[in-house]
From Swiss-Prot:
The lineage of its organism: Bacteria, Bacillati, Bacillota, Clostridia, Eubacteriales. The gene is murD. It comes from Clostridium botulinum (strain Loch Maree / Type A3). Its EC number is 6.3.2.9. It catalyses: UDP-N-acetyl-alpha-D-muramoyl-L-alanine + D-glutamate + ATP = UDP-N-acetyl-alpha-D-muramoyl-L-alanyl-D-glutamate + ADP + phosphate + H(+). Belongs to the MurCDEF family. Cell wall formation. Catalyzes the addition of glutamate to the nucleotide precursor UDP-N-acetylmuramoyl-L-alanine (UMA). This is UDP-N-acetylmuramoylalanine--D-glutamate ligase. It is an enzyme of class 6 (ligase).
Length: 458
């Protein structure tokens, strides 16, 4: 049952509130809390010089700042603490604050709790952003006032008072955001599950447990959408509290969506032919099927078909850049896990020259090597994980008695130069790192943009 936002306004007024993190996504939250009458202190590891003008901007509206290396040591004495999603709730500083009586929460928890609109929540290891965007586009095409947020778009909590009951909200939710959730969206989807973010989660079990929070608190009239082709998600049907729809690329599904004789269908109704879809790869057909399940109750077949046959993809996701000397370049910088890179490799008709490697999330690369060795012509590796990925592939190559050239490089520029020199006419070169970007870049967008800039300068 949704709570009225006036309850939150009454609760937060005059409260001593700490907001941990002064990043771009938290700034609207800080300003909104001030507007609601809270006494806000913003915490950040960065010093004033690094933060730039935002520190002055916040101080001018009455926000106190706690900055620098030991910033979390000063979390005592607050009524409410808004934590940044990637920070674990069991950090000693949060445990101590909670024991002292602080209410620890996050922007997303409070948003879902009080949002008057219908909320569609999407999580999973792969396909989240594309599916979130597809659901958003389908609802928008049908004529709904639709908002998009979570991991993409803009932070929505500051806009909550503009939202109405007949609006629609589509959220991409990470395991970090879901970890402390005690509220679930009315319509929820888990795209698939494979090991990811094990640098933050204790183990894969905890990662899966966090993902389940997207449906754990649903009611009997809510909907959960599950991937029938993924054993882990398929088995979650038994834990669902409301209705369940499933989607599949390989089996006929009557209570859900499937690919049947190259036709995309929802509950037996044909939407379109797979050859008419602009999105590249079977994984994107799965994303479309998942989106159909989510919007089935609210969107016409015509709106679904329009989006399916006109939507050409999201930047940094198997994005075609250009063709140089009959060699095609693709940017798949979003691929920050082995399973996502495998999905990208499967979307090409022939083995590719793959540029991979990056920040180490403590996840295994053996599944990528075993599933991808025959889809890669040349493997170019960089970043913290280069030797770890090389080792995984060398084992598989030795076992399969096959050949693959593996080249280690030290920068994106060198990777593109090597790929360009080694490529032959008709080859495909793709950046699909199988890793996060944080060893070399602040995020996957900046990594993808650098790759595109280098390719465009060839």
């Amino acid at each position: 049952m949704k709570s009225n936002f006036s309850k939150f306004k009454d609760f937060i007024k005059y409260k001593k509130v700490a907001v941990v993190g002064i990043g771009v996504s938290n700034r609207p939250l800080i300003k909104f809390l001030v507007k609601l009458g809270a006494k806000v202190t913003a915490f950040d590891k960065k010093h004033r010089e690094k933060l730039g003008s935002i520190s002055l901007e916040l101080e001018e509206i009455g926000v106190d700042l706690v900055l620098g290396e030991n910033y979390l040591d000063k979390l005592d004495g607050y009524d409410v603490i808004f934590k940044t999603p990637s920070m674990r709730i069991d950090r000693p500083e949060f445990v101590k604050a909670k024991e002292a009586g602080a209410y620890i929460t996050s922007e997303m928890e409070e948003f879902i709790k009080y949002c008057p609109a219908k909320v569609f929540g999407i999580t999973g290891s792969d396909g989240k952003t594309t599916t979130t965007t597809l659901v958003y586009e389908m609802l928008k095409k049908e004529g709904y006032r639709t908002w998009v947020g979570g991991n993409i778009g803009t932070p929505l909590f500051a806009n909550i008072e503009e939202m109405k009951e007949d609006h629609m909200v589509v959220l991409e939710l990470s395991s970090f955001q879901l970890m402390t959730m005690d509220v679930s969206p009315e319509i929820s989807l888990i795209t698939n599950l494979s090991p990811n973010h094990l640098d933050v989660h204790k183990d894969f079990e905890e990662y899966v447990w966090a993902k389940k929070n997207i449906f754990k608190y649903q009611s009997s009239d809510n909907l959960l959408v599950l991937n029938k082709d993924d054993d882990l998600t398929n088995g979650m049907e038994n834990e669902a509290l409301g209705d369940v729809l499933k989607f599949s690329l390989v089996e006929k599904v009557y209570n859900g969506a499937c690919l049947s004789n190259n036709k995309l269908t929802i509950q037996g109704k044909e939407i379109c032919d797979s050859k008419d879809i602009k999105l590249k790869g079977r994984h994107n057909i799965a994303n479309l099927l998942a989106a159909f399940c989510m919007v089935n109750k609210y969107v016409s077949i015509d709106s679904m078909k329009y989006v399916a046959t006109n939507f050409s993809g999201v930047e940094h996701r198997c994005e075609f850049i250009r063709e140089v000397n009959e060699v095609k370049y693709y940017n798949d910088s979003i691929a920050s896990s082995p399973s996502r890179t495998l999905a990208g490799l499967n979307s090409f008709e022939k083995p590719v020259i793959l540029i991979a490697g990056g920040y180490d999330k403590k996840i295994p690369f053996e599944p990528l090597a075993e599933g991808g060795y025959d889809k890669i012509k040349i493997l170019i590796l960089m970043g913290d994980t280069k030797n770890k990925i090389k080792s995984a592939f060398e084992k598989v190559i030795s076992h399969k008695k096959c050949e693959m050239e593996i080249v280690i490089v030290n920068s994106m520029e060198e990777a593109v130069k090597v790929a360009d020199n080694m490529a032959e006419k008709g080859d495909i070169i793709t950046l699909s790192p199988a890793c996060a970007s944080f060893d070399m870049y602040p995020n996957f967008e900046i990594r993808g943009n650098e790759f595109k800039n280098i390719v465009n300068s060839l």
